[in-house]
Amino acid sequence: MVKARRQAKILELVRTRVIETQEELAAALAAEGIPVTQATISRDIKELQLTKVPMPDGRYRYALPEEPGAAAGERWRRIFREAVLTIDHSGNLVVIKSLPGTAQGVAAAIDHAGWPEMIGTVAGDDTVIVVVKPADATGEVAERLKGLMR
């Protein structure tokens, strides 16, 4: 595999999953059909300037270099605070209403939070749907998201 493609896949994995160790990253790459050695992973992490940031539960995960030290950086919190109008939930879904044209930015902010209970977001023009797993965590996730509005 070409180095650039492998590193692009690493960035995608770190952006979309909670990766806590080099071993987890290697396993995720292998599952995508990209076998790598620990030495290669280590070099890629250094070249991509990935860092480890704390999660709300005290564990650490790999993060992209533009993410400040917290799982949801101040830039993302500001976008969230300025754009979100309401947050509600039902079943395993959290529905977020935002200013027209801002849902994509709100969804990106949520995705950057890296909370393991949130398995994905779907954004329209002014609405974001967050899919939560397990369903009984939906209320807690909605409250945590409301906390970002403050």
Curated annotation (Swiss-Prot):
A single MF term (Gene Ontology): DNA-binding transcription factor activity
Chief site of localization: cytoplasm
Record pathway: Amino-acid biosynthesis; L-arginine biosynthesis [regulation]
Location in the cell: Cytoplasm
GO biological process terms held by the UniProt record: L-arginine biosynthetic process; protein complex oligomerization; regulation of arginine biosynthetic process
Highest rank taxon of the organism: Bacteria
Function field: Regulates arginine biosynthesis genes.
One Pfam family in the UniProt entry: Arg_repressor
InterPro entries tied to this protein: Arg_repress, Arg_repress_C, Arg_repress_C_sf, Arg_repress_DNA-bd, WH-like_DNA-bd_sf, WH_DNA-bd_sf
Entry protein name: Arginine repressor
Upper taxonomic lineage: Bacteria, Bacillati, Bacillota, Clostridia, Eubacteriales
Gene name per UniProt: argR
Stated family: Belongs to the ArgR family.
GO cellular component, one term: cytoplasm
SUPFAM superfamilies, A to Z: C-terminal domain of arginine repressor (SSF55252), Winged helix' DNA-binding domain (SSF46785)
Keywords: Amino-acid biosynthesis, Arginine biosynthesis, Cytoplasm, DNA-binding, Repressor, Transcription, Transcription regulation
